[in-house]
UniProtKB/Swiss-Prot annotation:
It comes from Bacillus velezensis (strain DSM 23117 / BGSC 10A6 / LMG 26770 / FZB42) (Bacillus amyloliquefaciens subsp. plantarum). Poorly processive, error-prone DNA polymerase involved in untargeted mutagenesis. Copies undamaged DNA at stalled replication forks, which arise in vivo from mismatched or misaligned primer ends. These misaligned primers can be extended by PolIV. Exhibits no 3'-5' exonuclease (proofreading) activity. May be involved in translesional synthesis, in conjunction with the beta clamp from PolIII. Binds 2 magnesium ions per subunit. The active site is at residue 109. The keyword Transferase applies. It is an enzyme of class 2 (transferase). Keywords: Cytoplasm, DNA damage, DNA repair, DNA replication, DNA-binding, DNA-directed DNA polymerase, Magnesium, Metal-binding, Mutator protein, Nucleotidyltransferase, Transferase. This is DNA polymerase IV. Residues 8-189 form the UmuC domain.
Length: 414
């Protein structure tokens, strides 16, 4: 359908984990509730909370003790991952009744393209129907954005919560989108916003009118792309397989001489981990899986991998995983070449860290991880965050992030 505009929905479940808990236990409805691990410990933190709790000042990442001080009647429940995965599967099943073009973004949000379906002539009514079904059949509230592309649909869904439906047309951008602070633009995190502000850009409208050369000099190829988005230009299609796309960032190093010296080999890994980390950060992506390569003096090559429980782009996390693999699989013979590769990459904006609720204080001291944690929770408050442990599932084929990984693997099998 050349020349025909697309009709894209972005479906975002409202306070998903808390909403699932209320659906499971009706006695919680209308009450201030929060999902947090280790609820009996003062150092437990809030993962997400109901709108009733938010109205009392409770926020994501807030320690339980502080939340209780603000809202003494706050009901705190532990997370139930199986329950959330089950509800998510049901949610996506409903969406697929309207179109095959459903792209999961995370366990609680996704895109739909209804352009070439019978529903295209009644987009708003279709959104109302979807929202009503999610509420009636699953007892889960949602917000839906309707727009001609994915970026605008995402921005639209954020405009009315909970239970909002918003249509955002390109002609409305000057009045609706451009006055917003640059920090509220999807795809722009705290660090990127700080950089952009050095150009005198404070609003999305400023970015839309910004100097493309200056943006490219500052942000690389991402600069012009962000300007395009600010102008409502985003050609990316809804792709049901996008979550499974395979990408990688890696480096290897050939030693000047064959070596079996642990300290020397550790030094090589240290440099490789730094290189991979810097490349991941430049690309603003994180790796969900890590491979190492060991080539011995006789040219025998061994490759081993592990799935990371949390996406990683920091040198220490990459180094920790690489050395764990090396320690387990090195046969003590002289080595000629070593390599590290991060795979199954996800954009930082979509990297959901699973919360280690027992070590939050330690995690919170870690920069820049703490900054990113705040950023992710501000934009995706319903997601769990945990500092970078690893799951020892060598040769596993799972993809995705945190417990979302299990969900997306199930989705792929359907």
């Amino acid at each position: 359908m050349a020349g025909k505009g697309r009709i894209i929905f972005h479906i975002d479940m409202n306070s998903f984990y808390a909403s699932v808990e209320m659906a499971y236990d009706p006695s919680l409805r209308g009450k201030p509730i929060a999902v947090a691990g280790n609820v009996k410990e003062r150092k437990g933190i809030i993962v997400t909370c109901s709108y009733e709790a938010r109205a009392r000042g409770v926020k994501t990442t807030m320690p339980v003790w502080r939340a209780k001080r603000l809202c003494p009647e706050l009901i705190v429940v532990p997370p139930n991952f199986d329950r959330y995965r089950s509800s998510s599967k049901e949610m996506f099943s409903i969406l697929r009744e309207y179109t095959d073009l459903v792209e999961p973004v995370s366990i609680d949000e996704g895109y739909m393209d209804i352009t070439d379906t019978p529903h295209s002539h009644r987009a708003y009514e279709t959104a109302e129907d979807i929202q009503a079904r999610l509420q009636k059949e699953l007892l889960l509230p949602s917000s839906i954005g309707i727009a001609p592309n994915k970026f605008l649909a995402k921005m639209a869904s954020d405009m009315k919560k909970p239970l909002g439906i918003t249509i955002l047309r390109k002609r409305e951008l000057p009045d609706v989108l451009w006055p917003l602070p640059i920090e509220e633009m999807h795809g722009i995190g705290t660090k990127t916003a700080e950089k952009i502000k050095t150009l005198g850009i404070k609003t999305i409208g400023d970015l839309a009118k910004g100097d493309e050369h200056a943006l490219k000099t500052l942000l690389g190829i991402n600069g012009p792309r962000l300007k395009d988005k600010a102008n409502g230009i985003h050609p990316a299609e809804v792709n049901p397989e996008r979550i499974y796309e395979f990408k990688s960032v890696g480096n290897s190093s050939t030693l000047s001489h064959d070596s079996a010296d642990w300290d020397e080999l550790t030094g090589v890994f240290d440099r490789l981990a730094l290189s991979v980390s810097e490349r991941l950060q430049r690309k603003e992506v994180m790796a969900c899986r890590l491979f190492i390569m060991i080539r011995y003096a006789d040219w025998k090559t061994v490759t081993r991998s592990m799935t990371l429980s949390n996406p990683a782009d920091q040198k220490k996390d990459i180094m920790e995983a690489a050395m764990e693999l090396f320690d387990k699989h090195w046969n003590q013979n002289p080595v000629r070449l070593l390599g590290i590769t991060g795979t199954e990459l996800v954009e930082k904006q979509q990297a959901y860290k699973q919360l280690d609720l027992f070590s939050f204080k330690e995690d919170a001291k870690d920069e820049p991880i703490f900054q990113m944690m705040n950023e992710l929770n501000e934009k995706y408050g319903q997601n769990l965050i945990r500092k970078g442990a690893v799951i020892k599932k060598e040769e596993s084929k799972t993809r995705g992030t945190s417990f979302n990984r299990d969900f997306f693997q199930d989705e792929k099998k359907r």
